[in-house]
Amino acid sequence: MADESDMRNELNDMQARADQLGDESLESTRRMLQLVEESKDAGIRTLVMLDEQGEQLERIEEGMDQINKDMKEAEKNLTDLGNLCGLCPCPCNKLKGGGQSWGNNQDGVVSSQPARVVDEREQMAISGGFIRRVTNDARENEMDENLEQVGSIIGNLRHMALDMGNEIDTQNRQIDRIMDMADSNKTRIDEANQRATKMLGSG
């Protein structure tokens, strides 16, 4: 009888330990799911901010392009005014930056999404679950569902990271263009001011 009682107690202890491990494992998958969902939300916010920043850079580049067009008109007017005043005309194409033609930017919204790659986690889900079933109870069902969601979100995070990298590369190239345009516009404005000052002084 004592042996049976000891065995029963041992089995109860093993069952209690198994239940404890099951509860801890379930809680672990819940924490994992919460963490990747928070990461996904942060990724979405970052993509939105990058998109807004891209729109601002687009407006800045359009403004620089408009200044370029306005300067061409101003340089033409200064040349015409110089001719009327009997001054030696200075062709616009001799001005620094005057011959530069700016068109539509070469960078735009990423037109293609990265190819979807089926990794080991997704392959496990396709082949029948993320965990090896022991008790086949509701806890294991939830653990499997949680891990499936974690795997899916991690795949989305990978794609987000690729999109972020592409967008940042695009914006870096756009910033370089804007800097070049700003330098060119400043040079042309300075030279136009010098010409105008010379005309006024000669008058």
From Swiss-Prot:
Matching PROSITE patterns: T_SNARE
Record's compositionally biased regions (Basic and acidic residues): 1-11
Gene3D superfamilies to which the protein is assigned, alphabetical: 1.20.5.110
GO molecular function, one term: voltage-gated potassium channel activity
Positions of region (Disordered): 1-25
Annotated tissue distribution: Expressed in several regions throughout the adult brain, including the mesencephalon.
GO-annotated biological processes: clustering of voltage-gated sodium channels; exocytosis; locomotory behavior; synaptic vesicle fusion to presynaptic active zone membrane; synaptic vesicle priming
Compartment(s) where it occurs, according to its Swiss-Prot or TrEMBL record: Synapse, Synaptosome; Cell membrane
Cellular component terms per the entry's GO annotation: cytoplasm; membrane; neuron projection; plasma membrane; presynapse; SNARE complex; synaptobrevin 2-SNAP-25-syntaxin-1a-complexin I complex
Keyword terms of this UniProt record: Cell membrane, Coiled coil, Membrane, Repeat, Synapse, Synaptosome
Start and end residues of each t-SNARE coiled-coil homology domain: 19-81, 137-199
PANTHER family: SYNAPTOSOMAL ASSOCIATED PROTEIN, SYNAPTOSOMAL-ASSOCIATED PROTEIN 25
Family as reported in the entry's similarity comment: Belongs to the SNAP-25 family.
Function, in words: May play an important role in the synaptic function of specific neuronal systems. Associates with proteins involved in vesicle docking and membrane fusion.
UniProt-recorded name of the protein: Synaptosomal-associated protein 25-B
